[in-house]
Amino acid sequence: MHAAALGADAAMVSAVGQDARGDAALKQLRAVGVVCSAVARLPDHPTGVVRVSVDAKGLPSYDIAAGSAWDFIPSTSAVEHMAQRADAICFGTLAQRSPISRATIRRAVAGTREPAWRLFDVNLRQNYYDDAVVIDSLELANAVKLNEEELAAIARLCRLESATVVEQLRELSQRFGLKLAALTRGAGGSLLVSNQGVCEAPAPPTKIVDTVGAGDAFTAALLVGILVGQSLDEVNRSANAVAAYVCSQPGATPPLSSSVRLSVAKG
């Protein structure tokens, strides 16, 4: 949704149930311009539900319903066509918790055409992933976005030997042939490592209301910024600006202000 709000021709690959929640989800997606032709309607599985609770420090935890429609995303001609036309595709671990959706996602990512960006947004949620999914996803990707906890987990999994965060991201990129590694650090801003160099950006001063959705907003702005030709510094600044704005608003997908949208368009 954030990518569409930032002016991209955005599409979603997923599945919802033949239920009121599915109707509402599709209506909301289409209202902001997201193409939903690859979102399946499944009569035998309910639309996914996530219950979010926030602790005293403002950190969210998630109760993610099992057996949801998005655990059964079918591989269709619409998915294949969308992947072949994409300039960028974003995927994570959570939607790969079931074998059916995992196979569909892997096929879609593998079906993109060069020089499409294949960004692995790590999103390690509770016990909804295993080591094989993480490694397979890194091998499919040509870019990765992760937070500090996720980098620590991947450093252990991949036995990264580097001592510093920058060197860990470089080592990870070299091992898996990644063009870009993006590390988000909450109030500490973000760090981008690519063959263009290393770029750090601070997070703008923000009164935090709700951090849910900030990571997805960062990812959307990152990819849109790259696709419109921003420099690494511009991409980093604008992605931080979008994420900070989302943190200042209630809800995971608040309408973006015109100034925030302009920051991605101009860098």
Predicted regions and their residues:
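Alpha-helix C-terminal capping segments
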Residues: 1-9, 54, 225-229
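Ribokinase/PfkB-type carbohydrate-kinase core domain
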Residues: 6, 28-41, 56-198, 230, ...
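A glycine-rich beta-to-alpha transition motif near the start of alpha/beta enzyme domains, typified by
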Residues: 10-47
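Hydrophobic residues at beta-strand termini and immediately following loops
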Residues: 13, 64, 201-202
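A general structural signal for well-ordered alpha-helical segments in protein cores
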Residues: 22, 48, 105, 151, ...
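Catalytic-core segment of enzymes that process non-peptidic bonds
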Residues: 48-53, 201
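Conserved phosphate-binding/catalytic region of the ribokinase-like
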Residues: 158, 162-267
